[in-house]
């Protein structure tokens, strides 16, 4: 890193040369206390009113009597500047980073360091209702793209000095602020250090989105199930931190990462805790049942229709046979083709504008679906099975990516080897889930290894009077070895 220089002209020329052809770079040369100085800002990132009233006015109008530039610099910094965020930068790289973070950079002739003052004023999105984690009851606020605003939203939720927000810079070409959030009295120090080390080992040019950090934090990269959770809700993140987890906030994205992420987390939603226990437990069981349907139902149907027709009731068998008699494809090929078409239609609906996307969904679901059945390309029973599967896959939405691939694999297993291959595939899936241990915590905990006392928030939901007494931390789960996490 190159240090700032004492010679005023050298600093001015360096700034102007490095920001040549940058129309948003503004540099104002002036004089204060008999010495030359300059102010540098990025247009659009600072508040112009604060720049004039809180920084330039007081500094240029100061009557400072100092024998050396260093003494004058310290007096200006101590008595004249009214910015809350007041720091020093000794290198050009640090000064440029603050400059592009909404700070004003002040350089004085004869002083080899810069004064940086925070007067951010860029345009930002207001806190709105979360789109990916909608709820019927509860709060309606979500994180935004500014990491500073996200820190404030989290701090507002968790009014405790135990909440630590440790900031680091990632990216060699364009440093990006990344914040580690954790409760020092709840999270294990080994977990915090492991997450921080993984982030520091991520040698990226820049961090444009949170997804670029997921591969460095995920310990389950060879599995269908991720060890990294995401949320855009401050209330959800607060509850995860109370369980001893560590969160990662990234500048430029409203989604926050947290680890470790367990299998049971996929079936928990905010509304579960607002419902009465009996209904919350029913909804929770419904989610597990929907996950089973979305993964296994097409494969079971294909296996029964191809190899085990004797297990199907006679009336239903006649219905399936009459529908499939007119189609040119086998049950397995029909199921795969219908699923692939459904994924294409879903992807088109996501990428197109909302108004057009709804039209595509309606046309695909009604017109094309009915036309393919009428033309005899696919049978009506398989269309019903795929429709039920598609709807069920949205109930446990965090698992949608995994479910989309797994059900295709189980269709292949059922179509090629019948129920025997399907059962082997199920066993392999369960073994894979139970063998994962992200950051030293069993992924299937508290189901495997079984801990009955911790099941009150897994398959069903206990009342808050019991949950409040059992605020379990992830490192307290049976089989957890946080001290062995990497």
Residue ranges, per PLM feature:
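Hydrophobic alpha-helical segments embedded in or immediately adjacent to the lipid bilayer
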Residues: 291-311
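Membrane-embedded alpha-helical signal segments
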Residues: 1-296, 314, 434-486
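Generic detector of multi-pass transmembrane helix bundles and their immediately adjacent loops
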Residues: 300, 313-486
């Amino acid at each position: 890193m190159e240090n700032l220089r004492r010679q005023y002209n050298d600093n001015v020329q360096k700034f102007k040369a490095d920001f040549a052809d940058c129309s948003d770079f503004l540099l104002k040369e002036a004089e204060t206390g008999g010495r030359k100085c300059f102010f540098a800002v990025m247009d659009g990132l600072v508040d112009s009113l604060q720049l004039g009233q809180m920084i330039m006015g007081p500094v240029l109008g100061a009557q400072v009597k100092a024998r050396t530039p260093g003494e004058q610099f310290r007096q200006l910094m101590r008595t004249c500047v009214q910015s809350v965020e007041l720091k020093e930068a000794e290198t050009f790289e640090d000064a440029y980073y603050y400059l592009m973070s909404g700070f004003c950079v002040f350089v004085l002739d004869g002083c080899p360091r810069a004064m940086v003052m925070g007067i951010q004023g860029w345009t930002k999105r207001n806190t709105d209702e979360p789109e990916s984690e909608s709820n019927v009851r509860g709060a309606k606020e979500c994180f935004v793209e500014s990491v500073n605003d996200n820190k404030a939203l989290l701090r507002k939720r968790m009014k405790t000095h135990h909440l630590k927000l440790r900031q680091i810079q990632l990216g060699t070409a364009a440093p990006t602020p990344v914040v580690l959030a954790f409760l020092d009295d709840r999270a294990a120090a080994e977990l915090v250090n492991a997450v921080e080390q993984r982030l520091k080992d991520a040698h990226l040019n820049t961090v444009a989105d949170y997804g670029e950090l997921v591969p460095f934090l995920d310990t389950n990269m060879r599995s269908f199930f991720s060890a990294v959770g995401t949320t855009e809700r401050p209330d959800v993140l607060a509850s995860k931190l109370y369980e001893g987890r560590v969160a990662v906030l990234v500048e430029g994205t409203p989604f926050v990462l947290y680890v470790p992420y367990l299998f049971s987390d996929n079936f928990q939603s905010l509304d579960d805790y607002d419902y009465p226990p009996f209904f919350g437990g029913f909804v929770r069981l419904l989610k597990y049942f929907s996950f089973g349907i979305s993964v296994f139902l097409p494969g079971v149907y294909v296996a029964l229709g191809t190899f085990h027709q004797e297990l199907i009731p006679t009336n239903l068998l006649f219905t399936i046979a009459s529908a499939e008699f007119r189609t040119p494809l086998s049950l397995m090929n029909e199921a795969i083709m219908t699923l692939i078409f459904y994924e294409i239609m879903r992807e088109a609906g996501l990428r197109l504008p909302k108004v057009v996307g709804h039209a595509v969904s309606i046309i695909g679901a009604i017109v094309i679906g009915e036309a393919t059945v009428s033309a005899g390309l696919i049978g009506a029973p398989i269309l019903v099975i795929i429709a039920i599967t598609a709807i069920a896959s949205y109930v446990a939405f965090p698992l949608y990516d995994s479910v989309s691939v797994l059900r295709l694999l189980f269709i292949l297993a059922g179509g090629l080897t019948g129920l025997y291959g399907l059962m082997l595939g199920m066993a392999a899936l369960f073994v894979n889930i139970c063998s994962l241990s992200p950051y030293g915590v069993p992924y299937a905990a508290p189901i495997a290894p079984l801990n009955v006392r911790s099941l009150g928030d897994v398959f069903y939901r206990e009342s808050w009077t019991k949950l409040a007494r059992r605020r379990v931390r992830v490192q307290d789960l049976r089989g957890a070895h946080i001290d062995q996490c990497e």
